[in-house]
Amino acid sequence: MNRKITFCIPSKNNLRYLKNSIQSIKENSLHQNEIIVYVDADNDGTKEWLDQNNIKYLVNDTDIPKGIAYGYNRCIEAAETPIVCMFHADMYMGQWFDDAILKHLKPLSVVSGTRIEPPLHPKGLEKIVEDFGMYPEDFKKAEFDKFVYEMRYVYQGKTTKGIFAPWAIYKEDITSIGMHDEKLHSYHEDSDIFNRFILNGYDIIQTWEALVYHLTCRGGQFQDGIEQVTKDEFFHLMKNSSFKNYVRKWGTFIKNDEYQYPTIPHKYNVGIHIKNCNKQILNIIEPWGT
């Protein structure tokens, strides 16, 4: 079997969404592709479901999540195809997404698809806002499929310069720059690697013929039936740790243009003189100053 792309999908207690995601890849791919799921500190039956459906997966059996960066890296290492695609468990792939990606992908390039999102977040020049449902149970599949079919002709040949999930790259190219920085856990790992792609001269392409419906992290960031974000203490610790590590590394905050193409400012260095400093004060000040 000559498989083209490995879809890498980290998932933590997202079985409800993951089922739809995997179904869409199987049904809507033009080519034979591979799927690898990284099951991260899971307790919702994902591993058992993957076993039953003969889906390749890797697993973190501990109670402590490793994070999306770690999950992506393990999937990339295990991929048996020359091309890997970073995919989210709450994405539903439109028809022939894979073929549209392959049409533009070449060595030393990164190709992103185009997200269609419900009106949960503001509009952006890099995405399409259309409401095809907020949850897997109310997903309007027939309407979405029709929309994708029509938009493939409307956007035929259209590309812009932006980068975000889902994105694809040659396995050799992402391996050569060290893959994702695992110190960034589950947050800002994408901005970090996008910056490194640009600094290494990779061509950044967004194709508007490769469409996905994105439930905007409903599975990971929202409890079922509750509209407000709910996070535990561990989440906030990981997020704050990742953000500080990003600033330590880049000396700046994350910046993108209107199409979500990263702009990399000059690294700043702020010196702060504190009298009678102690570890508690230093922990608050660092990494904002040195």
Enumerate the predicted regions with their spans.
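Short, acidic, metal-binding catalytic loop of nucleotide-sugar glycosyltransferases
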Residues: 23-32, 287-289
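A recurrent flexible, glycine/aromatic-enriched loop bordering the glycosyltransferase active site
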Residues: 147-169
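Conserved donor NDP-sugar-binding/catalytic core segment of glycosyltransferases
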Residues: 92, 96-135
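A short, conserved alpha-helix in the catalytic core of glycosyltransferases
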Residues: 161-178, 183-211
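A conserved acidic beta->alpha catalytic loop
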Residues: 38-48, 92
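A conserved hydrophobic helix/loop-capping motif in glycosyltransferases and polysaccharide synthases
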Residues: 5-17, 21, 28-29, 38, ...
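Short aromatic/hydrophobic "clamp" motif used to bind/position activated sugar donors
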Residues: 84
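Glycine-rich, basic loop-to-helix element that forms the pyrophosphate-binding segment
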Residues: 61-79
